[in-house]
């Protein structure tokens, strides 16, 4: 295990440096400044200074507008609208929407379906999804309609996510579980990842999801402990998120657990490392890092642009700590398709191992 000690605000390591495979030592990584090097290399300001309104977008985050001529993208967008399905790709203004919906190199298109409507009962300060204390009631036909729609798309891995529904007794866990069950009936071989809320810490709701037949249980930590009250809704706590991830693994040992962290909100390297250790202690398998990007002027400002080089270093740290899979990059999101094929192999291998035993 890679260890570190705290001395006020400085990060120091023991004389025994732990080297990452084929890369710099963890000490070198921490000591290397992300901002100073990047300012010189890219010629832009990397950290938000006092009284500054916002940071200019760095070159590696500039993406093209989805092309209306892209057949797959246009077809999927029309289907989603016709079936009145909500996707986190659209609601959260994901920068990867064209890549995931279009498909490439014989890779099927991927969409992350957002269940239980497009209105959340929580108001996290980084998220652009609509909020309300009393969202519209659930559509009882949504589970079967969603399953049929996904079956028609012909994909082999799907991510189901949802808004928070604190207005419902079980937080909507039974609704999500019903969707998974219908999906497995329509497509027995499809792999299902559920990116779910914390259900206010309800372990019975966690059990409902974990026993639904899903393959990957995902719940996002979003940020480090210190920033959680500032970044997330007050009802979402750091320890509560750890609790649901830990219980999902205890309830179903074969399940793949997954979480995601946004960088650029003002966290320190030491705080990120502490979070990674917390996640490994409870057996989380997969991890993604992505750059926080302010969706509108009403949301939190970006405090720092993290360079692609720094994201690559975090990937190496994640791998060295023992995560089965670490996806790390400025535009990586928790449901980004890049890791789905790897996770699919992990799920299949675990299922095969369970059957053999």
Swiss-Prot record:
Q: Where does the Radical SAM core domain lie?
A: 105-324
Residues that coordinate or bind [4Fe-4S] cluster 2: 120, 124, 127
Keywords in alphabetical order: 4Fe-4S, Iron, Iron-sulfur, Metal-binding, Mitochondrion, S-adenosyl-L-methionine, Transferase
Necessary cofactors: [4Fe-4S] cluster
Q: List the disulfide bonds.
A: none
Can you tell me where the transmembrane regions are?
none
Is Nucleotide-binding included in the keywords of this UniProt record?
no
Does this UniProt record's set of keywords contain S-adenosyl-L-methionine? Answer: yes
Catalytic activity line of the entry: [[Fe-S] cluster scaffold protein carrying a second [4Fe-4S](2+) cluster] + N(6)-octanoyl-L-lysyl-[protein] + 2 oxidized [2Fe-2S]-[ferredoxin] + 2 S-adenosyl-L-methionine + 4 H(+) = [[Fe-S] cluster scaffold protein] + N(6)-[(R)-dihydrolipoyl]-L-lysyl-[protein] + 4 Fe(3+) + 2 hydrogen sulfide + 2 5'-deoxyadenosine + 2 L-methionine + 2 reduced [2Fe-2S]-[ferredoxin]
Question: GO cellular component terms?
Answer: mitochondrion
Q: How is the cofactor bound?
A: Binds 2 [4Fe-4S] clusters per subunit. One cluster is coordinated with 3 cysteines and an exchangeable S-adenosyl-L-methionine.
What GO terms are given for molecular function? 4 iron, 4 sulfur cluster binding; lipoate synthase activity; metal ion binding
According to its UniProt record, in which pathway does this protein act?
Protein modification; protein lipoylation via endogenous pathway; protein N(6)-(lipoyl)lysine from octanoyl-[acyl-carrier-protein]: step 2/2
Which InterPro entries does the record cross-reference, listed alphabetically? Aldolase_TIM, Elp3/MiaA/NifB-like_rSAM, LIAS_N, Lipoyl_synth, rSAM
Q: Which domain of life is it from?
A: Eukaryota
EC numbers, comma separated: 2.8.1.8
Q: List locations, semicolon-separated.
A: Mitochondrion
Q: PROSITE patterns under this entry?
A: RADICAL_SAM
The record, for Pfam families, names: LIAS_N, Radical_SAM
Q: Where does [4Fe-4S] cluster 1 bind?
A: 89, 94, 100, 335
Q: Which family does it belong to?
A: Belongs to the radical SAM superfamily. Lipoyl synthase family.
Q: Which PANTHER family match?
A: LIPOYL SYNTHASE, LIPOYL SYNTHASE, MITOCHONDRIAL
What's the protein here called? Lipoyl synthase, mitochondrial
């Amino acid at each position: 295990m890679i260890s570190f000690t705290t001395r006020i605000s400085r990060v120091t390591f023991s004389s025994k440096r732990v080297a990452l495979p084929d890369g710099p030592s963890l000490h070198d990584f921490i000591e290397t400044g992300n901002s100073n090097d990047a300012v010189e290399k890219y010629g832009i300001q990397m950290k938000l200074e006092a009284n500054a309104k916002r940071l200019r977008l760095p070159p590696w985050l500039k993406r093209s507008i989805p092309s209306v001529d892209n057949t797959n993208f246009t077809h999927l967008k029309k289907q989603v609208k016709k079936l009145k399905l909500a996707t986190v790709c659209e609601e959260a203004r994901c920068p990867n929407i064209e890549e995931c919906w279009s498909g490439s190199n014989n890779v099927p298109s991927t969409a992350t379906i957002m269940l239980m409507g497009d209105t959340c009962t929580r108001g996290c300060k980084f998220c652009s999804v609509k909020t309300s204390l009393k969202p519209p009631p659930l559509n009882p036909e949504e589970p079967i309609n969603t399953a049929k729609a996904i079956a028609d798309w012909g994909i082999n891995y799907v991510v189901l996510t949802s808004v928070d529904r604190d207005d419902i007794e079980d937080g909507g866990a039974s609704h999500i579980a019903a969707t998974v069950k219908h999906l497995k009936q329509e497509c027995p071989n499809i792999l299902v990842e559920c990116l779910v809320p914390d259900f206010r810490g309800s372990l019975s709701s966690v059990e409902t999801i974990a026993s639904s037949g899903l393959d990957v249980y995902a719940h996002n930590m979003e940020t480090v402990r210190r920033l959680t009250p500032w970044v997330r809704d007050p009802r979402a706590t750091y320890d509560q998120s750890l609790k649901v991830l830990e219980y999902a693994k205890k309830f179903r040992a074969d399940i793949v657990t997954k979480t995601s962290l946004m960088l650029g909100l003002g966290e320190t390297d030491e705080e990120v490392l502490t979070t990674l250790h917390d996640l490994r202690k409870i057996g989380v398998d997969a991890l993604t890092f992505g750059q926080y990007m302010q969706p509108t002027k009403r949301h939190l400002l970006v405090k720092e642009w993290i360079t692609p080089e720094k994201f690559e270093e975090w990937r190496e740290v994640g791998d060295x700590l023992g995560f089965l899979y670490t996806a790390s990059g400025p535009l990586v999101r928790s449901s980004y398709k890049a890791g789905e094929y790897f996770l699919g192999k992990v799920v299949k291998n675990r299922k095969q191992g369970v059957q053999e035993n």
